[in-house]
Amino acid sequence: MFSKKNLKWLSVLATVIMAFVQLGGALVTKTGSADGCGSDWPLCHGAFLPQNLPIQTLIELSHRAVSGLSLIVVLWLVIVAWKHIGYIKEVKPLSCISVGFLLIQALVGAAAVMWQQNAYVLALHFGISLISFSSVFVLTLIIYEVDRKYEADELFIRKPLRIYTWIMALIVYMTIYTGALVRHKEASLAYGQWPLPFNDLMPHNVQDWVNLTHRGMALIAFIWILITFIHAVNNYRENRTIRYGYTAAFILVILQVTTGALSIITEVNLFIALLHALFITLLFGLIAYFIILMLRTIRSGG
């Protein structure tokens, strides 16, 4: 059960389950299923499995089940990784972050159900779970020795790209928070057409301001990732990790902006909304890997 041969498939399983936790959370919010079990937690309407199962209750129960399963699988992965590859410097910190933020995520989710937190607190839930996902994702990359295959273990990231990337991480996280706030404030269709309601540009209420702020942050994120991508590709032509990684980040932000626009155009089509959540999850996981690479450079005296 805890042998090294289980490490690779277990890391993939943990990453996939954590991705489903992200999508499940988005699905709960988009379908208005947060109150699907009333104010009971961990029970649902006072029972382990209530007899009456409307779609909102089923969605909320499924999300809780997947979240519980993710904790079991991630704990299993962490124990195996700690035991067999704990000598790799990043493994133990990533393991602690994975479990720690998964527990915080569960507590915030439980508090939201039991005490009806306001939208600004609820918006933190998605960002917290993203940190846990990213830790598991990066741990998986390390387990599969992606570093060695793409010479990332010998990579030296110079200061300009490190600055670009730190700022990119901050901007993307702020964009994620404002996006989650849009969902929890039920502001997805506020502030009119995309990209702007040119016939009436002035926001009229809180929902309009929240939506406009998210659109502004998304634009800043797109421009900054484009600038960072151009710098990375032009200055690290010989390094596949940088070239492929930052190209993937730029592609993901294009997909993110596209699905964001389509969400408004289609009046929040559920499939497009879930793709929107998936692309930002993958983008943040990739940025987390960039951060690990930068920390290695700093640790080596760069």
Swiss-Prot record:
One of its GO terms (molecular function) is metal ion binding. Its cofactor is heme b. One of its GO terms (biological process) is heme A biosynthetic process. InterPro entries: COX15/CtaA_fam (IPR003780), COX15/CtaA_HemeA_synthase (IPR050450), HemeA_Synthase_type1 (IPR023755). The active site is at E60. Residues 1-8, 89-93, 144-161, 237-244, 293-302 are cytoplasmic. The chain crosses the membrane at residues 9-29, 68-88, 94-114, 123-143, 162-182, 216-236, 245-265, 272-292. Heme o binds at H63, H125. Disulfide bonds join C37-C44. Belongs to the COX15/CtaA family. Type 1 subfamily. This is Heme A synthase. It comes from Staphylococcus saprophyticus subsp. saprophyticus (strain ATCC 15305 / DSM 20229 / NCIMB 8711 / NCTC 7292 / S-41). The lineage of its organism: Bacteria, Bacillati, Bacillota, Bacilli, Bacillales. The gene is ctaA.
